[in-house]
Amino acid sequence: MMIARCSLFPPPCFSAVRIRCFAGETSDTGILFREKLIYLQDLNVDPHKALRVNPSLRSAPISSVVSVETLLSSTGLSRPAVGRILDMFPDLLTSDPESEILPVLRFLSNEISISEQDIPKSISRCPRLLISSVDYQLRPALTFLKTLGFVGRDTITSRNTVLLVSNVERTLIPKIEYLEEGLGFTREEVAKMVVRSPALLTYSVDNNLVPKVEFFIEEMRGDVKELKRFPQYFSFSLERKIKPRHRLLKEHGILMPLSEMLKVSDGQFNHWLLELRLRSAERR
């Protein structure tokens, strides 16, 4: 089982060689500090950024930093991936693997049933999981998401664990309320939408949902019921895809369901558009 591998018994490739390298036969703080900087650079972690964001790193023993890398690597993450995560979140460099990182890994494995093979995928896609409290963030978010229908075959997976780092009161509920009140959908209808398209819960209300709804209703003269059937509409760029394709269809007097209008590639869309224009010309 995954957690057995994460019990702070470092894999052979870490246990002897790397830690002994930095164990240091000197008490010279200057030398030890330089060794730490070299170690961070070897991980592709920016030492200056790390020290600025996490001042505690300056006095932390290098063995504690190595133990963090060891644990993360034992989940199956590659060393470059570990370095990228530690560079993004330097506070992890001085975290306690036993009390701060392992609880997150156990939560993913035991409470969400994410497989051992998918644990590194979850972490790579959403490194913020590692700095999130299980009790105050991850578990409350999971409980709320279950009420929306993220259970059974629709349960949270490694593809959408990013939802777990969203604050329920400040982030998730306002989006649900907008879809209910702004579009007139019931909670059940909204729940079906977000389960079909979980990314809906990651989009900004003001910067994504509102402008796309306004364009759909005011410019496209669309029926909001179509948004229920195709919630993926919100995942497409308004400026780069929705507006240009709508403009082309409007210019040629062609009506097309949202899913057909947006899901195909640019090449396929242009091919369809040409075919529709030719058929229209033949009918004349």
From Swiss-Prot:
What SMART domains does the annotation carry? Answer: Mterf
Cellular compartment(s): Plastid, Chloroplast
Where primarily located?
plastid
**InterPro entries listed in its UniProt record:** MTERF, MTERF_sf
Q: Which GO terms describe its molecular function?
A: double-stranded DNA binding
Q: What is the deletion mutant like?
A: Albino seed and embryo defective when homozygous. Developmental arrest of the embryo from globular to mature stages.
UniProt-listed Pfam families: mTERF
Q: Which UniProt keywords apply?
A: Chloroplast, Plastid, Transcription, Transcription regulation, Transcription termination, Transit peptide
User: May I have one GO cellular component term?
Assistant: chloroplast
Biological process according to GO = cellular response to singlet oxygen; chloroplast organization; DNA-templated transcription termination; embryo development ending in seed dormancy; regulation of DNA-templated transcription
Instruction: Mark out the transit peptide.
Output: 1-22
Annotated family: Belongs to the mTERF family.
**Function text:** Transcription termination factor required for plastid-specific rRNA accumulation and protein synthesis in plastids. Essential for embryogenesis.
**Record's protein name:** Transcription termination factor MTEF1, chloroplastic
List the source organism. Arabidopsis thaliana
UniProt gene name: MTERF1
